[in-house]
């Protein structure tokens, strides 16, 4: 919906529904090639005996997880891992409002390996998967040697199945689950509150040709600052305004998830733009409450109205302040 903030003179775009996953193709593509080359170098000759090959945990939890995994930092070394971590942290701060990531795993899937549906909320508000799987098919896609291996995420509307039930609709897997192919260099960030997993891999038993991914969680949402304004410059303005805003938000109907607002601040200190960088805000449905769309509008418009009215100290250049708001 498009809500007009009359006081600030801005139009604030508020989506009707949250966005629980996002796909970024070509994420650190050159560096991803470097990481893949390290892996290929160590697996090229299966007859070679080398300590670097003896690093995998065969993780099997009956009826839940079956895969090969290893800590990415141990596998790639501190320098390469540091570059990977830097790229992920930069993306996490800018787009997801998160200041840290968990230690990254690297996992390999060959024939019969999979992850059944699960939800792992405590680790962080966003999970991620970065694919190093080869695009080795004739058409340039992945999967010349196997089928399956997609990230699968349950569509949020199916969690309220009867509310959205349509007796005239045929419901098949694509209406229940979102499946995302492990294309090389593809970063998938998603809301781990939704049941998710990895579809079973069929085909190759050769780890050189299996599903290879890096994965972990973005965590620790907190404000970030870039440009002329520092945290110390902006904190006095933010502390007063956010205290009042939080007091109003607790009076609104309950919701779960997070939204993150990126503010563009002009050199004179005025806020000139607000962009929602991520949004998983999901109202808690109760019969006596307004519609979920109305609740989302109320919460996000309240946030936007408060932020667009802010006036920061003047500086000699533009700034961007990214503010996450978490609801439980």
Segments and roles (model prediction):
Residues 168-177, 184-328:
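Charge-biased low-complexity segments
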Residues 20, 102, 113, 124-128, ...:
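Residues that flank catalytic or metal-binding motifs in active/ligand-binding sites
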Residues 28-30, 111-113, 122, 133-137, ...:
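Short, solvent-exposed loop/turn segments at secondary-structure junctions
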Residues 127-132, 326:
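A contiguous pocket-lining binding segment that forms or flanks enzyme active sites
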Residues 2-92, 231-240, 244, 256, ...:
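Non-heme Fe(II)/2-oxoglutarate
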Residues 135-183, 200:
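A short beta-strand-loop-beta hairpin characteristic of the jelly-roll/cupin
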Residues 57-113, 117-123, 132-141, 299:
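Signature of the catalytic double-stranded beta-helix
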Residues 9-11, 114-119, 176-177, 201-203:
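Catalytic micro-motifs at enzyme active sites that drive phosphoryl/nucleotidyl and oxygen chemistry
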């Amino acid at each position: 919906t498009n809500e007009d903030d009359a006081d600030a003179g801005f139009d604030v775009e508020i989506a009707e529904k949250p966005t629980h996953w996002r796909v970024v193709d070509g994420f650190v593509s050159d560096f991803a090639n470097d990481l893949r080359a390290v892996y290929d170098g160590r697996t090229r000759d299966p007859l070679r005996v080398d300590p670097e090959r003896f690093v995998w945990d065969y993780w099997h939890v009956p009826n839940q997880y079956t895969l090969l995994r290893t800590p990415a930092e141990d596998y790639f070394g501190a320098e390469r891992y540091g570059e990977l971590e830097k790229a992920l942290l930069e993306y996490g701060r800018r787009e997801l409002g998160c200041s840290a990531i968990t230690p990254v795993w690297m996992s390999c899937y060959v024939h019969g390996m999979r992850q059944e549906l699960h939800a792992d909320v405590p680790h962080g508000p966003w999970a991620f998967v970065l694919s190093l799987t080869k695009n080795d098919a004739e058409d340039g896609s992945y999967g010349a040697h196997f089928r399956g291996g997609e990230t699968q995420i349950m569509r949020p509307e199916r969690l309220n199945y009867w509310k959205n039930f349509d007796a005239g609709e045929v419901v098949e897997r694509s209406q229940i689950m979102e499946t995302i192919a492990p294309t090389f260099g593809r970063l998938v960030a998603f809301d781990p509150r939704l049941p998710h997993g990895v579809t079973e891999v069929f085909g190759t038993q050769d780890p050189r040709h299996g599903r290879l991914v890096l994965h972990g969680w973005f965590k620790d949402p907190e404000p970030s600052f870039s440009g002329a304004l520092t945290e110390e410059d902006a904190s006095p303005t933010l502390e007063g305004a956010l205290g009042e805003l939080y007091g109003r938000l607790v009076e609104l109907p309950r919701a779960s998830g997070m939204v993150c607002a990126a503010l563009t601040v002009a050199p004179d200190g005025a806020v000139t733009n607000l962009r929602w960088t991520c949004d998983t805000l999901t109202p808690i449905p109760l019969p006596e409450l307004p519609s979920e769309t109305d609740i989302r509008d109320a919460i996000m418009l309240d946030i936007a109205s408060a932020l667009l009215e802010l006036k920061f100290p003047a500086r000699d250049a533009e700034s961007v302040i990214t503010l996450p708001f978490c609801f439980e």
